[in-house]
Amino acid sequence: MLERGKMDRDMVEFVVIDQLVPKEHLLRKVDAAVDFTRLYEMVEPLYCEDNGRPSIDPVVLFKMVLIQHLYGLPSLRRTAEEVSLNVAYRWFLGYTLQEETPHFSTVSYNFRHRFTEKTVDKVFAWILDEVANAGYLSPRAVFIDGTHIKASANTKKQVKEHIPAASKHYAKELMEEVNADREAHGKKPFDDEPPTSPRKPKDNTSKKKLARRKKQGFRTVTQSTTDPDCGLFVKGEHKRQFAYEAHTACDKNGFVLETVVTPGNVHDSVAFDEVYDKVTKNFPQVEAIVADAAYKRPHICKKVFDDGRVLSTAYKRPQTMKGGHEWWKYVYDAFYDCVLCPEYQPLNYSTTNRDGYPEYKSDPNICGACPTRERCTHSKNCVKTVQRHIWKDYEELADDARYTPEYRELYKKCKETIERVFADAKEKHAMRYTRYRGLAQVTNWVKLKFVAMNLKKLAMWNWRHHFHLLIFRLFYSEYARNPVVS
């Protein structure tokens, strides 16, 4: 039987807002997980105590941003519209059905000018403390990786810029060991100070050296005119876009421990030091670092193993000549300090370059008559050069860890930890691209997104734990009153 619904839109009804929100709603779980009044202690120094108009409750502002990131809303303007229409959002903020909600520009202005990066860091650390107090944090093994975030910039609006080359964190330590290695082999140590240009150079060699040194101090980058802080991210032959890179660390339960945002053209290994230092400072109980092959660099291996930790990484494909001998056929002899080639001929030490690679070169008279020279070298002077980093032993320690069952199984968890964090952030929380511009704004945006993800996981786990505990208590009380003997 066809029934026509009534369109009585002027009906007056008395309701309780709490009854309109389902008992298992996500915001109920989030509200029960933490005490949001802790936010007042963090933002109190940012407000004047006895002057100015009464402000909007800062807890409400933070809750609105949490709603945006929890549900993957694209902008604060859209979030403000949803808050004014959604009963559950109003209940979470503590607003009645007819009370006016904050304007999106108010939220945007406060997070741009009032709440600084330190405020966001305090909120991030506070949620991690709540997770640790609940017993869900497990930082013994830390998983580190990076993911790109598409920037709000057009790839066609770009310019070429010459910028100073960034100095490496380990440059001083590396140069000291390079000079020590050169002196041990009777070589002259490198001069760290660049040579000054004389008024009347003696020969052209000095000019070439000065030009080469000056050129090495700068690099050419593609810079966006819309957002100069982002970088050109290149992956493969076709993917080129302006982006930011979120270098992130998480534990085995998927809780984000730290994140560092850089331009998209910064390699993962370059940003590793900052992420690693922050994680180990906040969580000194870290025992293992799990990362992919992009982090298998000599200085990273040395840094991790010198700290008494283990680096668990993947197999890194060697970059050898196509159709040539396998890399493992060139064996380093530590006793004689030489390299044996596949034809069992020694490659003796020649020099150590500034990058930390001792060079071992063959005898051209022997290589000229070698039957497998075409598979070894194509140089005109018939000299084969093999480089071996002075910190190569630390890379071999990482390879040894890769073959142990414990760390092999630990690396397999990357797909369900750090990769899962990135997948959820992009698919469920709208982190695939950002509408913000500037490194500072994007950094706060990413950290608040990870705050929402950590808080959501904490709320879900707390709710599930209390639910299972309630079921156990009901079952135990029923069993105590009426035990069943099978």
Question: What is the meaning of each model-derived region?
Answer:
Residues 23-66, 71-72:
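Basic, short loop/linker segments at the boundary and entry of helix-turn-helix/winged-helix-like folds
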Residues 1-28:
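Hydrophobic alpha-helical membrane-insertion signals
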Residues 16, 35-38, 326, 348:
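Short, solvent-exposed coil/turn linker segments
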Residues 89-93:
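Short amphipathic alpha-helical interface patches used for protein-protein assembly/oligomerization
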Residues 3-4, 65, 72-85, 96-486:
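Anion-binding and metal-coordination hotspots
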Residues 18-20, 53, 238:
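Short secondary-structure boundary/capping segments within folded domains
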